[in-house]
Amino acid sequence: TDEHGDKIVKAAEAAGQTPQEFVDGISGQFQALWPKLGIKHDQFIRTTDADHKARVQAFLQKVYDNGDIYFGEHGGHYCTGCERFYTEKELENGLCPQHLTKPDFIQEKNYFFRMSKYLPWLAGHIRENPDFIRPERYRNEVLSMIESGALEDLCISRPKTRLEWGIELTFDKDYVCYVWFDALLNYISALGWPDGDKYAAYWPGEHLVAKDILKPHGVFWPTMLKSAGVPLYKHLNVHGYW
């Protein structure tokens, strides 16, 4: 279960609980559901697991040491539901395109991942490997995102003065990791990256995602992996809403 971020804090407050109490309850419901569906899992992953936190911090440090994380100031339209910033061009009549709600404008100092450094490489990789993102309509959508010139470097932190519920940055203890950067890493942290037996056996893997999270999986994730020197996933298989 993906357990960090602004919306978890807000939901916990509404329920009169701490974030940890809230996610423990929700995660427990998911774990209780699987046997009822006749499904047995090998390992249930939570992004609040100590092992996951340690691997996220190791990955962040690797990207930082590679010179791909810098400190800067950013102002943008932030949707709590999506837990991401939107550019003016991405908004629809000033509203979040997913939730149709007005995002908050937030101006603050944060850490950024040099995603733009890897966008030309990513576009080339997608063109050279036509089935990397499938079906074709979503491959074309990702290429359009990259080649539009609208993508900026990725803000990968939140100041503790605004949000304490997250994984602390090793290189600045006044900040926590942005939830998407943290959550995407469970694909490899669950396998014991960088040296676990399961990681060696099962990665690179296949991804199956819904169309609303195409950008994090089709743009954020492969550039993160490239920066850290981790092999890319085999394919990104995208479906509409079920």
Predicted regions and their residues:
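Structured secondary-structure scaffolds
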Residues: D51-R55, I106-W242
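N-terminal, positively charged nucleic-acid-binding surface of large information/translation enzymes
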Residues: T1-F132, L151
